[in-house]
Amino acid sequence: MPVVKVRENEPFDVALRRFKRSCEKAGILSEVRRREHYEKPTTVRKRAKAAAQKRHAKKLARENARRVRLY
């Protein structure tokens, strides 16, 4: 859990902003959303496989775009 120590003469808004940023970096909100509802292991694997295929297609598209030069 991110801990933010409020400095002397520091406005509350600034400390809150630092806390939110540290939570975002730690990935707490995304973890909470992911664990909000139970997801079957098959669904997890299926989603991970779909994400991997999407990443691969994106990588291939980038490589093909780099090869094709429009003159």
UniProtKB/Swiss-Prot annotation:
> Can you supply a Gene Ontology BP term from the record?
translation
PROSITE patterns according to UniProt: RIBOSOMAL_S21
Q: Enumerate composition-biased segments (Basic residues).
A: 43-59
In residue numbers, the region (Disordered) covers 39-71
Q: Which InterPro entries match?
A: Ribosomal_bS21, Ribosomal_bS21_CS, Ribosomal_bS21_sf
Question: Short name of one Pfam family for this protein?
Answer: Ribosomal_S21
User: Where is there biased composition of kind Basic and acidic residues?
Assistant: 60-71
Q: Name one GO molecular function term.
A: structural constituent of ribosome
Which UniProt keyword terms apply here?
A: Ribonucleoprotein, Ribosomal protein
Per its UniProt entry, which superkingdom is the organism in? Answer: Bacteria
User: Belongs to which family?
Assistant: Belongs to the bacterial ribosomal protein bS21 family.
Q: Which PANTHER family match?
A: MITOCHONDRIAL 28S RIBOSOMAL PROTEIN S21, SMALL RIBOSOMAL SUBUNIT PROTEIN BS21
Q: Which NCBIfam families does its entry note?
A: S21p
List, alphabetically, the HAMAP family matched. Answer: Ribosomal_bS21
Q: What is this protein called?
A: Small ribosomal subunit protein bS21
**Source organism (scientific name):** Vibrio cholerae serotype O1 (strain ATCC 39315 / El Tor Inaba N16961)
Whichever gene encodes this chain, its name is rpsU
